[in-house]
Amino acid sequence: MAPSRKFFVGGNWKMNGRKNNLGELINTLNAAKVPADTEVVCAPPTAYIDFARQKLDPKIAVAAQNCYKVANGAFTGEISPGMIKDLGATWVVLGHSERRHVFGESDELIGQKVAHALAEGLGVIACIGEKLDEREAGITEKVVFEQTKVIADNVKDWSKVVLAYEPVWAIGTGKTATPQQAQEVHEKLRGWLKSNVSDAVAQSARIIYGGSVTGATCKELASQPDVDGFLVGGASLKPEFVDIINAKQ
């Protein structure tokens, strides 16, 4: 990892937790040592964004797990970037594979969400990744490049964007991409950014890995030159998340 790219660890709590056990998790995180050269962001369920922001130490930022593409309107059940900011969160996760595959979100919709969230001043953790059949068909690059292009077309300022590579076959399955597999895709993504955005963005943009990251797998993954951090699911609800935060130490 280039020294200019600050290590980034996001915890995606998904649809888990209640105030009592999330409060315990927050106490654990507040007591944890967060290295000065590591940025930590937690994404609680929407209902608990306010609770998490009030309880979490300021050293840990808060993200929403999703948002809609406009500021207000007749969109029952949705939340806008302006509302997310109003609750004290500063980031949003967009394009997560569960949004793509469980809820049928298209590349186009995700791109529109990215554009609106950035315009409203949120940082964006933009997720991309191939399914198992796509990897086995040898089209990993094609898939992730197409997804990245739609995101890139909607980004003016890359300093507010973290790209999260999440091979769908490794999310919640216990299967982790090997450090070499992760590095290979991250390196190719950086090459795509160099060719299609700019060399400066390719050097500075953080590309993080998600997909069954645990305390046991994080150190070797973090040692890869193009892996700039993690987006962590299940393990972010456990004390081992502290080990992942310290993966570079």
Swiss-Prot record:
Catalytic reaction annotation: dihydroxyacetone phosphate = methylglyoxal + phosphate; D-glyceraldehyde 3-phosphate = dihydroxyacetone phosphate
Binding-site list for substrate: N12, K14
Cellular component GO terms held in the UniProt record: cytosol
Any one GO BP annotation for this protein: methylglyoxal biosynthetic process
The EC number(s) this enzyme carries: 5.3.1.1, 4.2.3.3
Modified residues (Phosphothreonine): T173, T214
Record-linked PANTHER family: TRIOSEPHOSPHATE ISOMERASE (PTHR21139:SF2)
Name the record gives this protein: Triosephosphate isomerase
Species whose genome carries this gene: Bos taurus
